[in-house]
Amino acid sequence: MALWVTAVLALACLGGLAAPGPVPRSVSLPLTLKELIEELSNITQDQTPLCNGSMVWSVDLAAGGFCVALDSLTNISNCNAIYRTQRILHGLCNRKAPTTVSSLPDTKIEVAHFITKLLSYTKQLFRHGPF
C-alpha cells in the first residue's frame, strides 16, 4: 500500500513538471523601458563596429514609436548585438497587424547612429512618459 501511495505521488509530481509551461509574467512598461535603456546603453558603449557598418532607414521615432524602430531594424541580418533589442522592441510594439507606411523614409543611417537616437528617445519617454 505504501508503495502504491509513493507511485501516485511520484506521478503527480512528474505531471506538474510536464505542465504546458510557466505562466508569462506581466512586465510593466517602465520596467521594459528600463531594460531597453540598459540594452541600448550596453550596445553604444561597445567600441567595436556595430553590425559591420550596416545601414537602416532613418525614421521619426516620435511619430511612429517602437514599431517603426522595430521595422527599421528588422532587415538587419547576422548581427547578434541587436537581437535582444529587437525582442524588447517587439514586446513594446503594440501594433496587431502590419500597417502601410504613408511616407517612405528616404535616408539611411548607420545602425550605431540609429541605436543612439533610439536610446535618447527611450530615455526621454522613460523620464516624461505617461505611466
UniProtKB/Swiss-Prot annotation:
It comes from Mus musculus. GO terms for biological process: cellular response to cytokine stimulus; immune response; inflammatory response; interleukin-13-mediated signaling pathway; macrophage activation; negative regulation of complement-dependent cytotoxicity; negative regulation of endothelial cell apoptotic process; negative regulation of inflammatory response. Disulfide bonds join 51-79, 67-93. Residues 1-18 form the signal peptide. Keywords: Cytokine, Disulfide bond, Glycoprotein, Secreted, Signal. InterPro entries: 4_helix_cytokine-like_core, IL-13, IL-4/IL-13, IL-4/IL-13_CS. Belongs to the IL-4/IL-13 family. The lineage of its organism: Eukaryota, Metazoa, Chordata, Craniata, Vertebrata. This is Interleukin-13. Interacts with IL13RA2. It is found in: Secreted. The gene is Il13. Its main location: secreted. It comes from the Eukaryota. Glycans are attached at residues 42, 52, 75. GO terms for cellular component: cytoplasm; external side of plasma membrane; extracellular space. The keyword Glycoprotein applies. GO terms for molecular function: cytokine activity; cytokine receptor binding.
